[in-house]
Amino acid sequence: LEKFHETNYRQGQETQGIKKEIFYWALEFATEYEFDNNSFIYKLKHKIADKLVYITIRENFGVLELIVSGGAAIQPRLARFFNCLGLRIFEGYGLTETSPVIAVSTNEKGGRKVGTVGPPLAGVEVKIDSANNEILCRGKNVMLGYYKAPDLTAEVIDSEGWFHTGDTGKLED
């Protein structure tokens, strides 16, 4: 996503005059994208930016309508940019030990929020260790243990069955 954004930015820099100004305005507008902003002025600005800039960028994606990311957190500016273009970004979180997803954003109202990964999947429990803000989870998706390594398993799965991810986080409503 970063490289695609950079490529489009460079292409915009090569334009001249009013086209360049409109391009920069549309990019700036995209960095302020809000999922649930329904004001008339916001919608009008978005429609103008879409007709003048975003539609051309979106053509590079063909029929692609959504992107699911889970390898690393997406920078908020990129998440806003691609969502503003009309390419829905869904962020997920998990580890190999959790087969591999714990939580993923959804398409429901309020289900996607920049900088978050969404609610836990059905059947997955998540909590935050108050001592160090570590993300803990348990569910049928979590491994039973490391193969022939009970000592390693005991380091990451406690007596109540909570898998300690080693990552820090927080829960939001």
In which residue ranges do the predicted regions lie?
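Conserved ATP-binding/catalytic segment of the ANL
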Residues: 120-129, 133-173
